[in-house]
């Protein structure tokens, strides 16, 4: 893991818990897996605890780690560092994605509530128009009651979000996910729908699909054009889900957007999305930061303790699940 992840996730308290659960080689942290020093460490390792900044675990890394039995990830997606070779060896892989989902869900719910009231955009209008409150009437409906939220992706985050929206009893929730169980969607308080049917009904479109080749630019010019005039796009998932050129054009024409992720990230300095009053941009802050990140390291340490005790993992990742998850 990188120094930022180490400092954020492993305080002296977490390090003490780590040392109580396993025999720890010193120094405990490596930033790469190819140097002679790292290879000496790998030769002895039975478990790797990984986080942000972990290099890919390629076949040559595994050849240097004959005793490796588990890779316990103290963050969300393992896609950037887990290779097929890891699964070929039968190595256990776990994730702390459930812990990372919580702050994203909370941020997204807040964004949707802001979207109902058009709060970020009216804040920009207030700076521009000051005491002339006529601008309030220019942002369309300013209520969440009886509105429609379209959730794309009944994922860890998407499913939690649907349940929270149900509990608020404000809006109808349409869920677009071709691989999700319709009964599970209904039980969570959503209604299964196709993207084509859902988009024209969306007062808020919230994206929660994984970044896969087949989901790249799933929201393009045609999909953005299908949204109602005063709709708000919320993206706290992955920037690659949206065609950026199409998004810039749509927002330039008036589409409202709350974007915590973009493609590329960060956007070029000359992107119009920085200055449009109908766009709110945040620098990928929805996920775990600060003290939130220690919930992920705590989950990884729990997985380590369970592994040491011969108990099954709480959140295993398989080759199949990785193919359809973020």
Where are these regions (language model features)?
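N-terminal glycine-/charge-rich "phosphate-binding" loop or analogous flexible N-terminal tail
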Residues: 1-47, 174, 325-326
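Glycine-rich Rossmann-fold phosphate-binding loop(s) that bind the pyrophosphate
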Residues: 154-155
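Rossmann-like dinucleotide-binding domain for NAD(H)/NADP(H)
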Residues: 230-326
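Phosphate-binding beta-alpha-beta segment of Rossmann-like dinucleotide-binding domains, i.e.
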Residues: 89-91, 96-148, 160-163, 168
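Alpha-helix C-terminal capping/helix-to-coil transition sites in glycosyltransferase folds
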Residues: 43-44, 64-67, 200-201, 226-229, ...
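Conserved S-adenosyl-L-methionine
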Residues: 167-171, 253
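Rossmann-like adenosine-cofactor binding region
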Residues: 56-57, 179-272
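Short beta->alpha connector loops at strand-helix junctions that form conserved
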Residues: 74-75, 92-99, 196, 284
